[in-house]
């Protein structure tokens, strides 16, 4: 059986007995700007990446809900590097491989399969960042919220009788943080409009998307 890039990385770390750490919900793995000696690889769980803006507001970047390297930014040789963003645990627990960052790059430079993973990682992150920027610039508040809700389908969506259940609790504050909206009341108002229009409903604090095409119609591409 041919392994995917991330499956190969996980099996490689297991074979080299790389230690793991476990963190509880709403604790932080790293903070933006903190000097860090390790590279972390999410083994299981859900995390959220964010940065703090100059005005003190938190701007959310992404959820990560499947195994992946948390950050490969910066150079390969320094024993420590400043972390590019905050990493907060959003599931009950999350488990990470904790790899000395210099050792990690030695693994990569000596293993073609890991080199391929790193190349694909950077391509994927660049593509995600460009798409996120496009949606922020080209959409108003409602379009940004519709784009964000639609993005949750791939991460947490599953089919139910009523539509597509987003099987993860996302708060209005989180939505505001992902969409660059400073007023929580704006999020509340637009979510109410979407419920009134039959686009979404809420059950047990989770969204059910009833009209995906409406969301897509609101997103500028």
UniProtKB/Swiss-Prot annotation:
Q: What induces it?
A: Induced by L-lactate but not by a racemic mixture of DL-lactate. Makes part of the larR(MN)QO operon.
Locate the HTH crp-type domain: which residues?
139-213
Database matches in InterPro entries:
cNMP-bd_dom_sf, HTH_CRP, RmlC-like_jellyroll, Tscrpt_reg_HTH_Crp-type_CS, WH-like_DNA-bd_sf, WH_DNA-bd_sf
Q: Which UniProt keywords apply?
A: Activator, DNA-binding, Transcription, Transcription regulation
What are the GO MF terms of this UniProt record? DNA binding; DNA-binding transcription factor activity
> What does the UniProt record note about how this protein's activity is regulated?
L-lactate acts as a positive effector on the binding and multimerization of LarR on DNA, while D-lactate antagonizes the positive effect of L-lactate.
Q: Which residues cross the membrane?
A: none
The residue ranges marked as DNA-binding region are 172-192
Q: Which Gene3D superfamilies match?
A: Jelly Rolls (2.60.120.10), Winged helix-like DNA-binding domain superfamily/Winged helix DNA-binding domain (1.10.10.10)
Question: What does the UniProt function comment say about this protein?
Answer: Positive transcriptional regulator that is absolutely required for the expression of lactate racemase (Lar) activity. Controls Lar expression by sensing the L-/D-lactate ration. Binds to a 16-bp palindromic sequence (Lar box motif) that is present in the larR-larA intergenic region, allowing transcription of the larABCDE operon.
- Quaternary data: Multimerizes on DNA. Multimerization is required for transcription activation.
UniProt protein name: Lactate racemization regulatory protein
